[in-house]
Amino acid sequence: METLNFQFPAAEPGRGRTLVGCVSSGDLEVLIEPGTAGSLQIQVITSVNGSAARWAQLFQRLFEGRAWPAVNIDIHDFGATPGVVRLRLEQGFEEIAHD
């Protein structure tokens, strides 16, 4: 198990909370909650040791250069592929946009 933390610039706090996905073989769950203005915080708890560079690259592609709401994201990973991670994050942001 490994715990990773990331931070990116953000706009105003998001409005809602959501939980998408579930932790099981090859998947992950993503919890998104309102955060502090100006900061998007991510904590990843993963079963895959030594994966920090992969997570950092994925988040840089997703979060740099766009105005995202200020949220706290908790990810519990059980070996999900980058495509599944992106899908779950997009689902989560879509959910909080409707709150």
Swiss-Prot record:
Key word Disulfide bond present: no
One GO cellular component term noted in the UniProt record for this chain: cytoplasm
Post-translational note: Covalently binds the prosthetic group of malonate decarboxylase.
Localization of this protein: Cytoplasm
GO molecular function: acyl carrier activity
Residues the record lists as O-(phosphoribosyl dephospho-coenzyme A)serine modifications: S25
Keyword terms, alphabetized: Cytoplasm, Phosphoprotein
Pfam families: ACP
Domain of life: Bacteria
Membership in a protein family: Belongs to the MdcC family.
Function (record text): Subunit of malonate decarboxylase, it is an acyl carrier protein to which acetyl and malonyl thioester residues are bound via a 2'-(5''-phosphoribosyl)-3'-dephospho-CoA prosthetic group and turn over during the catalytic mechanism.
NCBIfam families: malonate_delta, PRK01220.1
Identification of the protein by name: Malonate decarboxylase acyl carrier protein
Organism: Pseudomonas putida (Arthrobacter siderocapsulatus)
Lineage per the UniProt record: Bacteria, Pseudomonadati, Pseudomonadota, Gammaproteobacteria, Pseudomonadales
